[in-house]
Amino acid sequence: MQGTWFSLFVVVMVSHLACGGECSFGSHLADMAGLSGRHDKERHQAKKRYYHSMYGNQTPYPYANGQQASPPPQGQLLIIQNPDGSFMIVDQQGVPQVPQAAGGPGSPMNGGYYMPTGVYTAQVVPGTPGHPVQAIPQQPLRTQATATYYHPAAVPPPGPSVFVFTPSSVQPGAEVTPGYSGLQLRQQSQYGYSYPGTTSTPTPPPPASYGYPVFPAFPRLPAFSDSVSVSTEDSGLTGVKDSSSSESTVTPADEAASESEEGDKTSRKSKVKKGILTGLGVAATLAAAAAAAKAVKGFGGTRTSTAPAEAGKTELDDGYRPPPFNPRPSPYAELLKDLERMRKE
């Protein structure tokens, strides 16, 4: 039996070699032998390059042409103060150019990168420190910039300001690494920080050019006049405080007038209080009398009628009213007659 299987295997191999290895079974044996491994490797490398081009080079910076590309190694985070006193944060990736001199068309930076001048807007979320601040350029520049940063949690906003980034440990022109605890950066590269008043800060446009106010509007306090009238209800004194003097002047005549006025107010209040109490007492007496009369009537008391319309009523009209949906005589009619007869006797 073993000889038969061996002879069959020899016949199959000879037929495969005779047809040049084009048979399906022969090609399977060739694949097992590694003859087509080079083709599979090339196809795998092509797939790898294709998927890497789709998913392997993603950056958080979208460019104008819709393609994703690696940003320059350095950028600049501008902190611009508006003429109205508000702040906004603008992040812009630098363009590889020759460093410009002070007052040139761009903003000089370390490493030959500079900030193109332009108009910027800032989307600021009002609230406590920790809310995001997103800076978006108002018009397309040579490079697009869209970055989200956060308020420094260690620096609370003073007054009505939404956020202020002026840490004491950072000086104008200094570089801050992403490990700084006062600000959370998304990129793992150093950023140059520009402050208002330096050569690297572009001149911001007037506040009217922004789409909306960065800070909420707060009502202003009314202006104080030179003399303010101060009234004290506890002591009944009224003095005039002048802006030049720090004390109020009260004369004895004013004290006597205030005391007499206070006495008049007290007597007036007592009279009103007595009148109210008297009215309440009369109302309570009338209510009690009405309740007593109603109770007597309910227990069968005599009923005196003054209305002329009650003259034509029947003798059974002693406060009893049959329901309108049941006009038949009540079963208690006989009892009422007996009570009326007993009352007359």
Swiss-Prot record:
Coiled coil: none
Comp. bias intervals (Pro residues): 321-330
Composition skew (Basic and acidic residues), residue ranges: 335-345
Post-translational modification: O-glycosylated.
Record's keyword terms, sorted: Cytoplasmic vesicle, Glycoprotein, Membrane, Secreted, Signal, Transmembrane, Transmembrane helix
Signal peptide: 1-20
TM annotation in the entry: 276-296
Compositional bias ranges of the Polar residues kind: 227-251
Localisation per UniProt entry: Secreted; Parasitophorous vacuole lumen; Parasitophorous vacuole membrane; Cytoplasmic vesicle, Secretory vesicle
GO cellular component terms, A-Z: membrane; symbiont-containing vacuole membrane; transport vesicle
Region (Disordered): 227-271, 298-345
Disulfide pairings: none
Described purpose of this protein according to its UniProt entry: Major granular component involved in excreted-secreted antigen (ESA) immunity.
Designated name of the protein: Dense granule protein 4
Source organism: Toxoplasma gondii
The organism's taxonomic lineage, starting at the top: Eukaryota, Sar, Alveolata, Apicomplexa, Conoidasida
Gene: GRA4
